Amino acid sequence: MGRPRKDETTQDVRERLIVAMADRLIREPASAVTVTSLIKEVGCNRSTFYYYFADTEQLAEAALDAVVPVEIPRALLSLIRQGAFSLSPATPNIPDLVQRNAQGIDTLCAVLNGPNAALAQKRVKRRLLEDVLPDLGVSLSSNTDDPTSRIVFEYATGGLLALMAYRAETGFAYPVETFLHCLAPEVPAALLDVLSEKR
């Protein structure tokens, strides 16, 4: 596959394709999105598209990966290691991370409330399984492959993804901080207790 045209910078075109796909995922089924419509919207040629992505399915995965705020759970795990676990917005750095990831969080909420909810749930869980769950095992000195860890993980992520979809359903009537205040620290602490007691 040939390289993109000289006037199409690598980072710029790839990012524009990802942003365009993320917007499409909010409004229409991923299966309905075509390469032709995407390259017309972004203003690149077909060769450029295939230089970066094998197909629209791979682009959809990249678009979802781009809006998963993995920095936030990683920061929370860091607090676990320090013995100061909290989901409260008053916790140092957490408000900054929420603000920094605000656009991506809003996009993910909207996708989870749209025609690609199942696709988004599957991809987000996979990212968290790969990037966050292993760190949780290290923090708690536990085996993340055991049934208890997976059950708690599925329960926690399923609930959070449902809340994100609900936030979009309300027309984004509530800021992320409202959900954090409501859940913390009791809910995450209770789940951590389950993992600690049954590992």
Task: Show where each model-derived region lies.
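Short, basic, alpha-helical segments at the C-terminal edge of helix-turn-helix-like DNA-binding modules
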Residues: 34-35, 63-76
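Amphipathic alpha-helical packing segments from all-alpha helical-bundle domains
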Residues: 114-142, 147-162, 185
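Solvent-exposed, amphipathic alpha-helical segments
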Residues: 16, 20-28, 70, 74-78, ...
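C-terminal peripheral helix-coil segments that are non-catalytic and often amphipathic
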Residues: 134-138, 150, 169-199
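Basic, helix-initiating cap at the start of DNA-binding domains
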Residues: 1-32, 36-40
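Conserved acidic
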Residues: 5, 9, 13, 116, ...
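Hydrophobic alpha-helical connector segments
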Residues: 75-107
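Helix-turn-helix
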Residues: 24-58, 62
